Amino acid sequence: MKKSILTAFYGGTFDPIHNGHIKSAIALAKLIHLNRIILIPNGSPVHKPIPVASAEDRINMINLAISEISEDIFEIDYREINNKIPSYTINTFENLRKEYGPKAPLGFILGQDSFMKLHTWYRGYDILKFCHLLICARSNNMINLKKIKFKFIDPKILHYIPFGLIYYAFTPIIKISSRNIRLRYKFGISCNGLISSSVQKYINKKNIYKR
């Protein structure tokens, strides 16, 4: 069986991108030996409220955040944020599979909380027909592995098989949320340590979350 390097995609509203996004992604990259994580910011998310920050501001904040870290593994895919209609994850991965071909290993990074709601997504579990699911821990409450027919696998296998596996990554628990950061800005509470310094300056300069 021939090994190919797994390409991982990390979708989200990133409103704003914060240290939890970055640190959990880097931790996952080290666990499963990723050298490429492609961020896919949502345009009009189906399962979340309309973003507060504009598409342009969210893209600028992502670029600022990833420019501050030493790991050169992050890229941005603009397909969803440039889409004028709501984007479904299944459609994105159908297109990615066509672009990368049938044999390329692809992975979708999502938090434990999002994974537990996957059954509510449009064709949520069909995503496994196109990529692996890479689950990052979000709390100390462990997923009921038997209930979801979860199997622990050697992460090396993710680089040999193109799709269909679920991997639970014991990444550090980082209790940060974009919603909490927006509320902090609204009420004038410091966000030091939660987002990068350049993103903080950008938010303050444009007064994004105090409107």
From Swiss-Prot:
Arranged from A to Z, the UniProt key words for this protein are: ATP-binding, NAD, Nucleotide-binding, Nucleotidyltransferase, Pyridine nucleotide biosynthesis, Transferase
- Which InterPro entries does the record cross-reference, listed alphabetically? Cyt_trans-like (IPR004821), NadD/NMNAT (IPR005248), Rossmann-like_a/b/a_fold (IPR014729)
The EC number(s) attached to this protein equal: 2.7.7.18
Q: In which pathway does it act?
A: Cofactor biosynthesis; NAD(+) biosynthesis; deamido-NAD(+) from nicotinate D-ribonucleotide: step 1/1
GO annotation terms (biological process): NAD biosynthetic process
Q: What class of enzyme is it?
A: transferase
Gene Ontology MF terms? ATP binding; nicotinate-nucleotide adenylyltransferase activity
Which protein family is named in the record? Belongs to the NadD family.
- Output the HAMAP family linked to this UniProt entry: NaMN_adenylyltr (MF_00244)
Query: So what does this one do?
Result: Catalyzes the reversible adenylation of nicotinate mononucleotide (NaMN) to nicotinic acid adenine dinucleotide (NaAD).
Protein name per its UniProtKB record: Probable nicotinate-nucleotide adenylyltransferase
Whose protein is this, by species?
Answer: Wigglesworthia glossinidia brevipalpis
